[in-house]
């Protein structure tokens, strides 16, 4: 009776490449319309003002401006893009 399992090379030895998820633009950074802000699985972050959500929950900028992160209801974090001309008025 063998005391070691033979090889196993055909069963093991596979792994998938990383999916490159995460935040791509951080708070205060300038976003151009269409820029991806976050790639995620599920809704870790939620879209706020001037931010859209794709089929795969990717958040992207709808207008040019600066990225902001804010805590909201139910402990959700909302990502918004504040237009540059609106920030100058504040």
UniProtKB/Swiss-Prot annotation:
Q: Which UniProt keywords apply?
A: Ribonucleoprotein, Ribosomal protein
Q: List the disulfide bonds.
A: none
**UniProt cross-references to InterPro entries, sorted A to Z:** Ribosomal_bL27, Ribosomal_bL27_CS
The family database entries (Gene3D superfamilies) matched by this protein are listed as: 2.40.50.100
Per the record, the domain of life is Bacteria
GO CC annotation terms, alphabetical: cytosolic large ribosomal subunit
- What SUPFAM superfamilies does UniProt report for this protein, alphabetically? Ribosomal L27 protein-like
GO annotation terms (biological process): translation
Family annotation (Pfam families):
Ribosomal_L27 (PF01016)
What GO molecular functions are on record for this protein? structural constituent of ribosome
The family assignment reads: Belongs to the bacterial ribosomal protein bL27 family.
Record-linked NCBIfam families: L27 (TIGR00062)
What is the protein name for this chain? Answer: Large ribosomal subunit protein bL27
The organism encoding this protein is: Paracoccus denitrificans (strain Pd 1222)
Q: Source organism lineage? A: Bacteria, Pseudomonadati, Pseudomonadota, Alphaproteobacteria, Rhodobacterales
